[in-house]
Amino acid sequence: MGVWAATQVMGKLQETDTALVIKNSIAINGTPYPIDDTYGIPTAIYHGTLEGLTGPSLHKFLRRMCFNGEAFKEFLNITPRRPLEELKEELAEIERMYLSLPAASFYWQQAVVGNNDRIIPPDNQLNAWRKEAEISRKTLRVHYTEDAHYQVELFRYYLQEIWTKD
């Protein structure tokens, strides 16, 4: 949901501060359409996750975010522990906001799509970025990786090697 949230925030910032210059924007394993059968997480899967959220199902979801068992263990060491009710409320609120807010007009220059993403189907991500390129009529570079939805090496690369380089 981070790409959608960033799209909303950055779109608002650009509306209010016309002098704001974004040199580079990279969406990683997400889309501006968080709940969508073609461009995001399929609606039935999202609702199934929300309605069936339990301790064991959350554990399974978090495991699916990671590439393998070792990556999952590392992820568990850094992820915050939150009450299930709080997570359910957040998921319900994300859907409410997604359905009620106008589409943001933020333009992503690059997108990273992990072929091993088991949260947002890679084909849906590709569909979303094709749609965004058509809407904006701008070039959008899509990078294909073999990464999972969350992969520490991927984020480390983009945060340390790319983002801090300039």
Positions of the model-derived regions?
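Gly/Ala-rich beta-loop-alpha elbow adjacent to hydrolase catalytic centers
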Residues: M1-A6
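Short alpha-helix in the alpha/beta-hydrolase fold that links the catalytic acid
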Residues: Y107-Q109, P121-K131
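Catalytic active-site module of serine/aspartate enzymes centered on a nucleophile-bearing elbow/loop
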Residues: E134-D166
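Short, flexible active-site-adjacent loop segments at beta-strand->alpha-helix junctions, enriched
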Residues: T31-P34, F67, N115
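The feature captures the conserved acid-bearing segment of alpha/beta-hydrolase catalytic domains
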Residues: E95-S105
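Short beta-strand/loop motif that positions the catalytic acidic residue
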Residues: A111-V113, D117
